[in-house]
A protein has these predicted regions:
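Beta->alpha loop/short-helix hinge microenvironment recognizer with preference
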Residues: 1-298
Length: 298
């Protein structure tokens, strides 16, 4: 087993056979080409020469693809610098919005609409509850970031929200709740569930949804209705992480999340002729790291 391998090595070894047995979209094919050819000379080179000693250095250009693990550091730093003007020296909290896994087939078949619905439900929940005088009674700020994967490379759409811990009331006075988050998690859960499910139902009633693969049964009204009932009955589980330690930590944390891809090079621990092994957090075991070996479907 080779241990010194990268995402690029994995694509070089497995992509051609994967492409021959799977339906690949033009966007996916373009990303794969970029990853396989990044910093190889395929995108040109820069040559620099030292005027003193005459030493010549050749630098291969990167692909700059959003999905490439080798191309995120510079965009991240550029984005972080731009956000410094937006961050206040005030408490911030990290709230994560998730949906029941039963919805995954429909979301996967309707990514444009149902990713947008995630943003709508999360942002409306935060804004409306924060404006309620029972909780804070202010107009707050937040940044929402969509991730579509879990640590084990599974399909797991969820929203990371970085929430300002205070805001301006109707008299334009600043108001916050100190180091404690100002919204009850159970209230967030019920509100978010109601808003997301309402938009999902509206899309179904307006015949805007498509049903491919494992989502096909939900084209039937009664099967779809049963799915809605199942999801309404479940307790949706958003959670709030501890507050950040100052504005700079907020910015750094944001950069990590906005420019993260599904898996990075350091998590690839080995590769054979038929499998790839990578490390992942096991959230069913207190977030301890474990190794997972999978076949070419990686």
């Amino acid at each position: 087993m080779s241990k010194d391998c990268t995402i690029q090595d994995v694509f070089h070894h497995f992509y051609s056979s994967f492409e021959s047995t799977h339906d690949i979209s033009p966007t996916q094919r373009k990303a794969a080409y970029h990853i396989m050819n990044c910093k190889t000379g395929a995108f040109g080179v820069n040559v620099s020469a030292c005027e003193d000693c005459g030493c010549i250095s050749v630098h291969y250009n990167s692909c700059r693809d959003r999905c490439c693990p080798m191309c995120q550091e510079f965009p991240k730093e550029k984005w972080v610098d731009a956000r410094r003007e937006d961050i206040l020296d005030a408490p911030y909290f990290h709230v994560v919005f998730t949906v029941p896994e039963e919805l995954n087939p429909i979301i996967y078949s309707n990514q444009k609409f149902l990713y947008a619905a995630l943003y709508h439900a999360a942002s409306d929940t935060l804004s409306e509850l924060a404006a309620d005088s029972k909780y804070l009674g202010t107009d707050i700020g937040y940044i929402c970031i969509l991730h579509t994967w879990g640590s084990t490379m599974n399909f797991h759409p969820h929203i990371h929200a970085i929430v300002l811990g205070g805001g301006l009331d109707v008299k334009n006075h600043w108001k916050d709740n100190g180091k404690d988050f100002f919204l009850p998690i159970k209230v967030i859960s019920k509100t978010f569930r109601g808003k997301y499910m309402a938009e999902l139902k509206q899309l179904w009633e307006n015949d805007r949804l498509e049903f491919h693969g494992s989502a096909a049964p939900y084209k039937n009204y009664y099967t779809f209705k049963e799915l809605l009932n199942t999801c309404y009955a479940k307790e949706w589980i958003p959670y709030c992480k501890k507050p950040f330690d100052g504005a700079e930590s907020v910015i750094r944390y944001l950069g990590k999340y906005t420019h993260r891809i599904a898996i990075s090079n350091y998590r690839i621990t080995g590769m054979t002729e038929s499998t790839v092994t990578f490390s992942a957090k096991d959230y069913k075991n207190q977030g301890h790291w474990k190794e997972i070996s999978i076949s070419v479907d990686f």
